[in-house]
Amino acid sequence: MGARKRLRAEKLKSEKNLTALASLNSSPIAPRKMRLVADLVRGVEVNKALNILQHNSKFASKSLEKLLRSAIANWEQKNEGKSIEDEKLVVSSIQVDSAAMMKRIQTAPQGRAHRVRKRSNHVTIIIDGAK
């Protein structure tokens, strides 16, 4: 491996250590409802985001809080000996994607039936040091 390629690889590896990722798959909450809560904490410092999620009354905030705690634990595992407060971690991105839908039938008048789509979502959260 050449010198430039090695330096580039080392730089990418050090940048990768500064970020942490956590994902939640097939959460049984509609993506639209989850996005309402995700928009509150996107781009916010980690401690402030945890505070926002703890005091939010929406059901989706509980699962997002758990996911954020998991991302923090992943970051601590990568960066042993470093403190969250010193690094000023920020929720750099949250992606809420729709997952598989469960299709159910609800009875309707005159012998008909309507389809009910129970939606679920995938959430990916990335935390990063403030720049």
Where would I find each of the regions flagged by the language model?
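Conserved residues at beta->alpha junctions
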Residues: 28
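Structured, basic alpha/beta domains of bacterial-type, RNA-associated proteins
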Residues: 2-25, 36, 40, 45-131
